[in-house]
Amino acid sequence: PRLVSSAASDVYKRQPVSLLKQGSSLSTSKKLLQETAKDLTQLLNEHGVEAELTNVVPGPTVTRYEIELAPGVKVSKVTSLSHDIAYALATPDVRLLAPIPGRSAIGIEIPNRQRKLVSLGDVLSSSEATKLTHPLNVGLGLDIAGKPRLLNLSELPHVLIAGQTGAGKSSCINSIVTSLLIRTNPDDVKMVMVDPKRVELGQYNDVPHLLTKVITNPKKAVDALSWAVAEMDRRYDLLADGQ
């Protein structure tokens, strides 16, 4: 591959965020939250756990119920009840944060009965995203409190995306790539994509941000990586000469 400045980049117009689909608005029922909080408090009392429910944080897929233990109550008394909590609330899974990082509280995360579909458009059109000026800020999703989460790739030179089948690896990669296409010009960012399965990245073949067509041949993939290493070393040399 050879890095070439595109003549079309002088007139390149970034695509608007409005092209991206946004998720449907779905608010969690306050009555349902109150009922779940009551059931949770009752269960803790039945098991002799003295605790106070201090906050409820509804998110797009799960709701976190935050409790503070009475003096002398061990955290293990709550963590040992995860299966009992799931059974009592008729939910397949419960996640415990014991404690919530940086706080003297325990978080009990329970899946919502109705989950909100989070789309990339929700993230990139948010006020948090529009305030960010660095072109390598990419959208990941919404956190448990429904706040947009973005990541600056310049601060993460090495990223490994892993997970079991259906965990959302491809969706994550597509969100990163789409964020770059929306937020950058072709002369600012060039990408090399390798897709040995030939089914994941073919839709990006015609975008101007690609340095070369999506690579599907393993040998060409090795050649592309070798070029990338050589280009990296060349830039290091330029930086060293400029010091």
How would you name each of these model-derived features?
Residues 1-8, 12:
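Single conserved hydrophobic/aromatic residue that forms the stacking wall/gate
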Residues 4, 33, 74, 154, ...:
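Short, conserved glycine- and acidic-residue-centered signature motifs
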Residues 5, 34-37, 79-82, 174, ...:
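Hydrophobic face of alpha-helices
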Residues 9, 51, 100-105, 109, ...:
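P-loop NTPase catalytic phosphate-binding loop
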